[in-house]
Amino acid sequence: MALTKADMAERLFEEVGLNKREAKELVESFFEEIRQALEDGVPVKLSGFGNFDLRDKNERPGRNPKTGEEIPISARRVVTFRPGQKLKSRVEAYAGNVKQS
């Protein structure tokens, strides 16, 4: 089961004591700040978690999987995420203990 923004807001309500409206607004505001920074071309660095960066990809040849026809894949900007060392360590520590769904 995936962790959702609603789950995060619920945890803020339960553990921090914000009311549900404030918790939802805080979660939305947090992600809006990340979206806005990336939209403005600013990398996002969250210490202990990881970095969101922008990368420009050049146009490249591609293929339509149904027809086999060659088609160009246009140049575009993509968001990349690189996990920080603390996050990597914690995930790797649990890698053998959790069943994948």
Swiss-Prot record:
- Subunit structure and binding partners: Heterodimer of an alpha and a beta chain.
Cite the entry's keywords alphabetically: DNA recombination, DNA-binding, Transcription, Transcription regulation, Translation regulation
Q: Which GO terms describe its cellular component?
A: cytosol
Q: SUPFAM superfamilies from the xrefs?
A: IHF-like DNA-binding proteins
GO process terms (BP): DNA recombination; positive regulation of metabolic process; regulation of DNA-templated transcription; regulation of translation
Function as written in the Swiss-Prot or TrEMBL entry: This protein is one of the two subunits of integration host factor, a specific DNA-binding protein that functions in genetic recombination as well as in transcriptional and translational control.
Taxonomic classification: Bacteria, Pseudomonadati, Pseudomonadota, Gammaproteobacteria, Chromatiales
Similarity remark = Belongs to the bacterial histone-like protein family.
Protein name, please?
A: Integration host factor subunit alpha
HAMAP family per record: IHF_alpha (MF_00380)
